[in-house]
A protein has these predicted regions:
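Autoprocessing Asn-cyclization modules and mimics
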Residues: 170-290, 295-309
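Extended, Lys/Arg-enriched charged tracts that mediate electrostatic binding to polyanionic substrates
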Residues: 44-122
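A short, polar/charged loop-to-alpha-helix boundary motif
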Residues: 451-464
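Short, polar loop/linker segments at the starts of domains and inter-domain junctions
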Residues: 28-41, 100-114, 150-168, 327-328, ...
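Short aromatic-cysteine micro-motif
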Residues: 74-84, 115-169, 310-437
């Protein structure tokens, strides 16, 4: 037997594929060989699979050189260094995906090969993305991106433990002056005049220094108190009391009361309440509901409480009741739509377009590899990874968990799979080093390069990789499906079967349930063009998942429930 034939046989012996008949309600996949014929696998086969075992956690700097830990979990690496990116390496995947009637087949391989049945296993388009040339590997953020800023004041997305996922209108950029004490991440910073409080995420100094008490620059805050606008106020609110919406039942502890016009005595006081905490419900403004507090305060809501409260320019800013700096402005809530998120992902590498927001070929390849590894679409039911962060209360501000929460970085097995130590439905999952991916939950993630259109077709970044994904997609950069976007929302099953969508998971029906078929929820498009989100938020329950797809947002959407995961394709 020739050397080439021996090598080919070795490759084929390693190939494991999956198939599923989508007319059946079962969530389980079956296993097959390189030509789609059924096989039975021994327990633990995954540890010997070159693709799954080749997924390893590493850290990468701006030069793009990976440093690996002592095992696939990444032991020995510093996951909290904001100057590096904590990534998961995915080795090149060759393969094929096809349908026989209603049965879908996915057969991945570590090398290119022609099967005995004549099927060519070719390089997956994820490894042509962001440039158009073939790659031997790609890298995906271990975590949803957090906010970081470098010494030059450039904001960038960072995959690091301890970071709060960066989501829209949730982070506040605040100028400061007269800085005398350098803060620490997670310190609470409070305005002495406004009463507004936020948690420190990052900062940079543009002039002066801490030692000379004249540091000036920008500080970035999360979990900033909220603003509830009101009018027709007849009785003053009292700080420390709980404000309650008469019809919504929304609550929040009153931190400060700001009257901008009118007077309580004449029943026309207008302004806003600074509120903190509460039950997270939004106040009703159409029609305006009555807000009251326990001391008799009364007014009507003209704001729902989702807007961040402003600081007072030039006020003292304190940490633990000690003044550490002064506010340079009122603060700005940072928008974060898909294009902006992609820009912050690319900002880490400067102008290097090999960095960016995860694209659909990468995202859906990982989804198919998860199905291969775990054997089911009902991943939230697996004890090994749990349900993820999917059952926390709906909130007006970010209500998920931070990257690395509940000790998950150490709680997983040596292959990077497991769950945090917190309560079921409120603790993160991890699969092969990727937090919050296979169960969905915590936040939705933008997927740049797939564009839904209401009552229209899907536009998809061209699989040849020559065009860089953008939002909206640039003319000439994409292919389009023949099949129209599914305009019915629901738990979905089969995906579109056509050449343009060969490698992607675009819903073709809404015939599943939370425990049948795909087990994850699809929301139909509402805009032309729209933007695609994957995963699901911290309160979405069984609707979240690795195949959770939300096509109902506009390209301009910026929400505290939407973030993103970065990729680097060297």
């Amino acid at each position: 037997m020739g050397q080439f034939q021996v090598r080919t046989d070795d490759i084929l012996d390693e190939v494991v594929g999956i198939y599923k008949d989508w007319t059946q309600t079962t969530p389980f996949w079956s296993y097959c060989d390189c030509d789609g014929d059924p096989i039975t696998l021994p327990t633990g086969w995954q540890t010997r699979n070159p693709l799954l075992s080749g997924m390893k956690t590493c850290i990468i700097d701006t030069l793009g050189v990976p440093i690996f830990g002592d095992n696939p979990r990444g032991d020995g690496l510093n996951f909290a260094d904001k100057t590096k990116q904590v990534m998961v390496r995915v080795p090149a995947v060759y393969g094929d995906r096809w349908w026989e009637g209603d049965t879908e087949f996915f057969v991945p391989s570590r090398s290119p090969v022609t099967t005995p049945g004549g099927r060519s296993l070719t390089l997956h388009p994820a490894f042509h993305s962001r440039g158009g040339w073939p790659r031997s590997e790609l890298f995906v953020g271990r975590y949803y991106c957090g906010l970081a800023v470098n010494s030059a004041g450039t904001k960038y997305a960072v995959s690091a433990s301890g970071k709060q996922p960066w989501t829209g209108v949730e982070m506040v950029e605040l100028a400061f002056t007269n800085g005398s004490v350098e803060p620490a991440v997670n310190d609470y910073l409070t305005g002495l005049t406004s009463g507004v409080r936020g948690q420190v995420v990052d900062w940079y100094v543009s002039s002066g220094g801490w030692g000379t008490s004249d540091a000036a620059g920008k500080i970035y805050l999360g979990l900033v108190d909220e603003r509830v606008n009101f009018n027709t106020g007849s009785v003053a609110f009292t700080p420390g009391q709980t404000a309650t919406g008469g019809s919504s039942g929304a609550t929040g502890i009153v931190v400060a009361v700001v009257v901008t016009s009118g007077a309580w005595g004449s029943g026309d006081a207008a302004g806003y309440l600074v509120v903190r905490g509460g039950n997270g419900k939004t106040f009703t403004i159409s029609p305006s509901e009555v807000i009251t507090d326990g001391a008799g305060g009364a007014a009507k809501a003209t704001g729902d409480g989702t807007i961040k409260a402003p600081f007072t320019s030039s006020e003292d800013l304190q940490i633990s009741a000690s003044t550490v700096m002064k506010a340079g402005d009122a603060g700005t809530s940072l928008s974060l739509n898909c294009s902006e998120m992609d820009g912050y992902c690319r900002a880490y590498g400067g102008t290097d377009t090999r960095w960016g927001l995860i694209n659909p070929y990468t995202n859906d390849l990982l989804t198919m590899l998860a199905y291969l590894d775990l054997g089911t679409c009902n991943i939230q039911s697996l004890i090994s990874v749990g349900a993820g962060v999917t059952s926390k209360p709906a909130t007006r501000m970010f209500g998920g968990v931070n990257n690395g929460a509940d000790g998950i970085d150490a709680a997983v097995d040596i292959y990077g799979t497991g769950k945090g130590t917190g309560a079921a439905g409120q603790t993160p999952s991890m699969w092969r080093g990727l937090q919050d991916f296979v169960t969905g939950g915590n936040v939705y993630g933008f997927v740049i390069g797939t564009q839904p259109n209401k009552d229209g077709v899907w536009n998809i970044i061209h699989p040849n990789g020559l065009s860089i994904p953008s939002s909206p997609l640039a003319a000439g950069s994409f292919v389009s499906t023949i099949t129209q976007c599914l305009m019915s929302s629901g738990y979905w099953g089969a995906s579109i079967k056509e050449a343009a969508a060969k490698w992607l998971l675009l819903p073709a029906d809404a015939t599943g349930t939370n425990v049948q078929k795909r087990c994850d929820y699809y929301y139909a498009p509402n805009y032309v063009p729209g933007v695609l989100l994957a995963g699901g938020g911290w309160h979405l329950g069984s609707g979240a998942g690795v195949a959770g797809r939300y096509a109902g947002s506009a390209a301009s959407s910026s929400s505290r429930e939407i973030g993103g995961r970065l990729e680097f394709i060297p």
